[in-house]
Design a protein with these regions (language model features):
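Proteolytic processing junctions in secreted/extracellular precursors
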Residues: 2-10
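Phosphate-binding P-loop
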Residues: 10-17, 90-92
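Short hydrophobic/aromatic beta-strand immediately N-terminal to the Walker A/P-loop
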Residues: 19-21
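The conserved Walker
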Residues: 25-26
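Conserved glycine(s) of the Walker
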Residues: 29
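Conserved substrate/cofactor phosphate-moiety recognition/catalytic segment
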Residues: 32-96, 108
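Conserved phosphate-donor/acceptor-positioning beta-strand/loop module used by diverse small-molecule
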Residues: 118-139
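Conserved GTP-binding G-domain of TRAFAC-class P-loop NTPases and closely related GTPase folds
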Residues: 133-223
């Protein structure tokens, strides 16, 4: 059962019923893009990577992702996913605005999640962070947690193969591509992306399911 504070946060969240799916392979710079394009909006970030890396450090496992540690690493990944899924469920229960971080390699998984959110009244969008393979591999080597190069290449190819599918699923007006090959030295790129995100967030909630939920929660609050 939600507390009074949780109820208020959901009902009066300025970005209620808004969800942004983030796609981009290892080395695409997704975390930086999220910070620059959604920072200050109050959207809740759903990302198991930070928790996973915390658990890796606690277990004293190598961030170079050595194959000899795959079993122990999978245990920590499962722990991180469990915590993240619980947080996500709590956010969704309050219908809070979300940024759901992922690689985008599995179109079926993301489209299924997005469809589920749409069924309860969410507006769903995607921010697709695009880079060349060369840039992605170079950036991957500079990451704290390095993905093996062969795996990074395969993931990049999988993500790239889904661009058209994602654009068709979310629709051109709800699909933002960020070309992140070159450094955004003057800030124009991220300023442009931020404005696009803000424009999507500013759309009024018009879904009947969302409105019904809001009316129900308001009545509960007034009791």
């Amino acid at each position: 059962m939600k507390s009074f504070t949780d109820l208020q946060e959901g009902l009066y969240d300025p970005n209620i019923f808004k969800a942004f799916f983030l796609a981009g392979g290892p080395g695409s710079g997704k975390s930086y893009v999220v910070k620059k394009s959604t920072g200050g909006t109050g959207l809740k970030i759903v990302n198991s990577d930070d928790i996973f890396e915390k658990y890796l450090a606690q277990a004293k496992l190598d961030f170079k992702m050595q194959s000899s540690q795959s079993g122990e690493r999978d245990v920590q990944r499962a722990r991180a996913k469990k915590v993240t899924d619980k947080r996500k469920a709590n956010y969704i229960e309050g219908r809070l605005g979300l940024v759901i971080d992922g690689t985008g390699k599995d179109f079926g998984k993301i489209s299924s999640q997005a469809a589920g959110l749409k069924q309860i009244g969410y507006d769903v969008h995607m921010i697709f962070v695009n880079t060349s393979l060369e840039v992605a591999l170079a950036n991957n080597k500079q990451r704290k947690r390095v993905v093996p190069e062969k795996l990074a290449m395969n993931m990049w190819k999988q993500v790239q193969s889904n661009i058209g599918k994602f654009q068709q699923f979310f629709g051109p007006k709800n699909f933002i591509i960020v070309d992140n090959d070159m450094p955004d030295l003057d800030g124009r790129l991220f300023d442009h992306v931020f404005k696009k995100v803000k424009a999507l967030l500013s759309r009024k909630v018009d879904n009947w399911m969302a409105k019904a939920w809001m009316n129900k929660e308001l009545k509960l609050k007034q009791r």
